Amino acid sequence: MQQKKILFIINPIAGINKKKKVPKLAHQYIDSNKYEVHIAHTQYAGHAKLLAKKAVNDGFNVVVAVGGDGSINEIAQQLIHTDVALGIVPGGSGNGFARKLGIPIGRKQAIEVLNEAHTIQCDVGLMNDKLFFSNAGVGIEALIVNRFAETKMRGFVSYARWALHYYATYKPQKYTIRCDGMSFEKKALFINFSNSGQYGYQIGVAPELSDISDGLLEMIVVEHFSKWRALYLLPMFMLGKAAKVPYVDVIQTDKAHLQCESETDAQIDGDPAGKGADFEIKILKGVLKVIVPSI
């Protein structure tokens, strides 16, 4: 059997824990009859994208993202429309994309999944000119993401602290939404487009509707609600039942257009994506090969 070339791209600062043990684990648990293991560490923002592009050009068969949804985004951008498979060893804060695919959060177990070499073709989202793999959104959730990115403290507690801080003062925006031949207005705290059905941290978004290969996105529109109702909404998200909340609308669509009354924050896969008032969103069906557990 001819060995395939596999490259692990490690983001050493993603998430809460460092990734120092991954190279050792990769050499220890990857089947050497199947793969020739290579390791690379990112050194600055955007470096993962360059490493992945070089790997494609150099004939690698698998490129593994060791990090969170942001790291996956940088790497997977270079793999769409190619025969190079994306592997994932979760190492971020939320790990929403990996959770949706059933990839173990444990490093050893995630590495062992790569030996199975079982692949599926995943959909990819596009917001204006930016690709997303787990989800993208605008409004207060994106504002929170922007502030979360600026803090050194990672994890759910830090994210929740920023959420509580901004909810008290955030003013909902009015959006004009067009999709599936409809046009309507909503005053919303945020609008999220989910490919994976996951925010991360086990927080689900209409998981019963989400299929990462169905050619559809779930558009989640969350209207303004009282602070007391916030105590109800979070558990419903944690249980994957947000779609059953009266002030949450979930619409499946393959494309949509948002127009906001003023510029608002945007996020892509949990990373800041600037500001804007006009957003075109669509799905690219089955353009990314990903290694997932066979069962």
Residue spans of the language-model regions?
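ATP/nucleoside-binding phosphotransfer catalytic cores, i.e., glycine-rich phosphate-binding loops
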Residues: 19, 179, 221-295
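A generic structural signal for short beta-strands and their flanking turns/coil linkers
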Residues: 171-173, 187-189, 213-218, 252-254
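ATP/NTP phosphate-donor binding region
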Residues: 1-63
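Short Gly/Thr/Asp-enriched flexible loops that form oxyanion-binding sites at enzyme active sites
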Residues: 71-84
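Catalytic core of DAGKc-family lipid kinases
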Residues: 33, 81-85, 89-190
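Short hydrophobic-aromatic micro-motifs
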Residues: 130-136, 185-186, 190-194, 199-200, ...
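Glycine-rich beta-strand-to-loop/alpha-helix junction loops that act as flexible
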Residues: 12, 66-68, 91
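Internal helical hairpin/lid segments
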Residues: 192-233, 238-242
